[in-house]
Amino acid sequence: MKKTDGEDKLLSISQVAKTFGIHQDTLRNWEKKGLITPLRVGTRGDRKYRPEDLEKIMDDMSIVKDLGLPEADDGKMNLTQLKQFLWKSADILRGKIDSSDYKKYIFGLLFYKRISDVWDEEYEKVLAEFGDTEIARADYNHRFQVPKDCRWEVVQNEAQNIGQKLNEIFDKLTNANSPKLDKIFDDLDFANKDKFPNETIQRLINHFSKYSFGDTYISSDLLGDAYEYLIEQFAADAGKKGGEFYTPREVERVIVNILKPHEKDHIYDMAVGSGGFLLEAYHYLKDVAGEKKARTLYLYGQEVNLGTYGIAKINMFLHGLDSASIERGDTLSDPKFLNADGSLKTFDICVANPPYSIKDWEAETFKANKYGRITGYEMPPKKNADFAFVLHMVKSMNENGRAGIVLPHGVLFRGGAEGRIREQLIKNDLIEAVIALPAKLFYGTGIPAAVVIFNKNKSEARKGKVLIIDAEKDFEEGKNQNRLRKRDIEKIVSTYDSFKDVEKYAREIDLKELEENEFNLNVRRYVENGDEEEVIDVKSVWQELAVIEKERDAADKKVEQFIKELKY
């Protein structure tokens, strides 16, 4: 057979994958759409591709090469490759949509691709076992229901109105999986052509079509870890708004390692954000006791923001934690986790990083005290919701409950109603520890925060005492963001566990000393952090000032002389 011109430069399917990171399913999809035509080479008619044809398509779609993606023979990405791949999907939208907004669209598409590919895998597995298409399609053989007209291939083959088709598919998926997927896609509108021209959505679809996201190729742990990475990257990208849905994992780790979840614990986050605290609790127990026991945890969370609620739900699903109960609503005015008699449900562990110092909140509804949250306490200020969150958390702890909450430092020392609430919490012996964190740990703010640990069942040795820890100096400095290192986390946790004084770092304070200090919990009041006060030599300073003044006078005279010479 005559050799095709330039045959030596043609690429096989596996070579295309190695060179360009393009999955064979993506190639076939391009062939169906007429974007590329393979050459038939050799006696067997092997399919080969011209590199220049592939480069043209990739340039048109702005697909990035050299991601280090695996060959198409196994189609599996490792964690680093998966992180890169997912972050590249954001590049397609970056600059077209506000950085704080496009994350939910990426997450929505990723989740849709995942459940569609998993459905296909489940179908093929059951079909191979029973040889019956009806059984293979049966609802009970699938974790999520994906109707035929909702499969990923449907949007792959849609040419004109992809955005509208996606909206229709998300509605159908929600209905087919209600109440499991209720509200998850409600904040997405791909049909807005000002935001999403057809070409932009097509590029997103083509990008996600490169690889299968089924369980065979990407495990729940791998995809879950990559999803959490993506959340963190979006938080960094969004700046100040990033702090609204993301708490640094190191801070979550401090609190969870202090509270130490046990098998079958009920864990609640009243301001769940993207779900990081709940997942950290799961990861903690998985590390210390194994996955089987970690999956016995009961996880609960409430989130007021619709888009963030969807992100949290997807986060749980991608980690395989389908039983996690995430509800949408305002925790302070409309708490969702209630007992049959309408009272607040209580939990073994409560965790939260609520929004700081909200001025506009449903104070009047809270004051009505429907859930008994201010019984025994004063009403928090109408212009600051910090202690409203604290009192909600305290009321949500069961009789043996432990809790950890991230708060602004003002909560530790402000007076008025807040001071009286703090006094009562201390007298009720509910506060176990206060930990001052370094500045610039949180996205969008350089203000340092504190962690307050509550315990309704203190050990005898800790009753009537509060441990104050000053961890402000222990961190790794970054350009825009500081981080707690592993050793910093371990130091905080071990100090809490030992509950003993550590010079210039921690002090155990009794109720008498707190009372003498008017129940002020300001960390600097109790812990000398090692900063030596600068000794000022007044005489030397005056001498330096006199020299500076003489130099200034001489400069003024020169300026006056110049002005005279210029005849101004």
What are these language model-derived features?
Residues 51, 61-72, 341-568:
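A conserved structural/catalytic subdomain of Rossmann-like adenosyl-cofactor enzymes
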Residues 5, 288-290, 441:
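Residues embedded in well-ordered secondary-structure elements
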Residues 113-126, 234, 285, 289, ...:
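A generic secondary-structure signal for well-formed alpha-helical elements
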Residues 241-352, 357-368, 373-377, 387-388, ...:
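Conserved S-adenosyl-L-methionine
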Residues 75, 194-197, 215-219, 244, ...:
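Alpha-helix initiation/capping motif
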Residues 2, 6-10, 15, 19-25, ...:
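Non-catalytic, mostly N-terminal accessory regions of nucleic-acid modification and defense proteins
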Residues 20, 93-94, 230, 260, ...:
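Generic helix-packing signal
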